[in-house]
Amino acid sequence: MVSRVWRPFLFGFFAQGHGEIGVPPYETAVISGIGCSSRLPYYMNTYAMQTIHGRAAAIATGFKVANPDITVWQISGDGDGLAIGGNHFIHALRRNVDLNMILLNNRIYGLTKGQYSPTSERGLVTKSSPYGTVEDPFHPAELAFWRPADVFFARCIAVDGAASVEVLKAAANHKGASVVEVLQNCVIFNDGTHASVATKEGRAKNAIYLEHGKPMLFG
């Protein structure tokens, strides 16, 4: 039985995408930090480590430098990856080591029971912001794009399996650092945070699917 803590992106689409990429398990490592997202290594038949809070990007960088022939996937949540781990995230981009960073963004701290995170929307009422957050959120894409041309960035939503798999495959084929932001719901502490693109109808109105070399289509 799959743990209920596992979200749709984790128990289905990552495994499917990894299988379609075709890299064997003994040439793959999955490295995580701390948080709901960070259970992934336990369910992968690959080299894997769950590391300490905020340090996954640094450890993944070291693993890749020491084992250049291994495909490395690093997975974090928005709190793990952009708060305590924000410095390591930025320097992983600066170094542009060939690793794949997945950032599950539900705009909340879920494992610690509902505090606001670096990506929480201004005004969000949480256990740590009872009168609403007074800070503007980080936008992971803006952090990734400060290093032009070299870094791969893509965003998908966890409930869109087909697009998620294609994004993961594109990230894996990129030589250099890749960042995949996965818009993820937290049904307990921040339900509906990505409601505008959570349904097919919503995505038809509010999402633009971009493919390299193809025109942008609106509506």
Task: Walk through the language-model features, giving the residues of each.
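Glycine-rich ThDP/TPP pyrophosphate-binding loop and its adjacent helix/strand module
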Residues: 84-98, 104, 108-219
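Conserved residues at beta->alpha junctions
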Residues: 5, 76, 158
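Thiamine diphosphate
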Residues: 31-110
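Solvent-exposed alpha-helices and their adjacent loops that cap or buttress functional pockets
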Residues: 3, 21-25, 51, 64-68, ...
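Structural element of the ATP-grasp superfamily
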Residues: 14, 62, 141-144
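A generic local structural motif
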Residues: 16-18, 59-60, 86-87, 165-166
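Generic structural signal for well-ordered, non-membrane alpha-helical segments
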Residues: 3-11, 52, 56, 133, ...
